Amino acid sequence: MSTTLTNKNVIFVAGLGGIGLDTSKELVKRDLKNLVILDRIDNPAAIAELKAINPKVTVTFYPYDVTVPITETTKLLKTIFAKVKTVDILINGAGILDDHQIERTIAVNYTGLVNTTTAILDFWDKRKGGPGGIICNIGSVTGFNAIYQVPVYSGTKAAVVNFTSSLAKLAPITGVTAYTVNPGITRTTLVHKFNSWLDVEPLVSEKLLAHPTQPSQACAENFVKAIELNKNGAIWKLDRGTLEPIQWTKHWDSGI
């Protein structure tokens, strides 16, 4: 069911990153009420730019590391909800691409996403009297088919797809819908220099960038289109400047 972003309150985790910042710029053009950006590193110039694009949108920044204990996330969310009262959409966008950092890759790309999602359910879950909400999780095309030289990163993104698909099926119980946006190779600092697992391919970043890529601006525009389409359970592929729904093949059914 499509949605308008006008007057919506959005929390964007990692909304100042490569794709994140361009997406934040597109979001404020949609006349949000509040854009709350959570990121590890403050960027006052970027925040000022977002405010200048559309002064009607209240843009707020809070420092946030997704690897903190879930109790810290809940505490931060209480502060945010006390200020904006309601939150309509959570975008989980934190990610690193460095298979030398195995534990941190898993902590940022998957565990942190799960914990942030779990924490906001305290405020949204209709079983607790909550109003429900929408979760947009950023995955990657590597969640469909791995870049085998970075198996840790690829594994976390496959986990994001499965976790989010489960959230979508739980919507009748929780009132919270969910979908993934999965960018292809996008020209950002994330892919300019990174490390393969056990250095199996020292030139992996150069080889990836030799393939067809997309600018982050094109990815951001399709990102916001996917948010506006608001299709529960959707698995969106954002590759080479296009937006395409993925039809997931079922090879097994739990039967429950």
Swiss-Prot record:
Pfam families: adh_short. Its EC number is 1.1.1.1. GO terms for molecular function: alcohol dehydrogenase (NAD+) activity. One of its GO terms (cellular component) is cytosol. NAD(+) binds at residues 12-35. Keywords: NAD, Oxidoreductase. The active site is at residue 153. Substrate binds at residue 140. GO terms for biological process: alcohol metabolic process. It catalyses: a primary alcohol + NAD(+) = an aldehyde + NADH + H(+); a secondary alcohol + NAD(+) = a ketone + NADH + H(+). CDD domains: ADH_SDR_c_like (cd05323). PANTHER family: ALCOHOL DEHYDROGENASE. Homodimer. This is Alcohol dehydrogenase. The lineage of its organism: Eukaryota, Metazoa, Ecdysozoa, Arthropoda, Hexapoda.
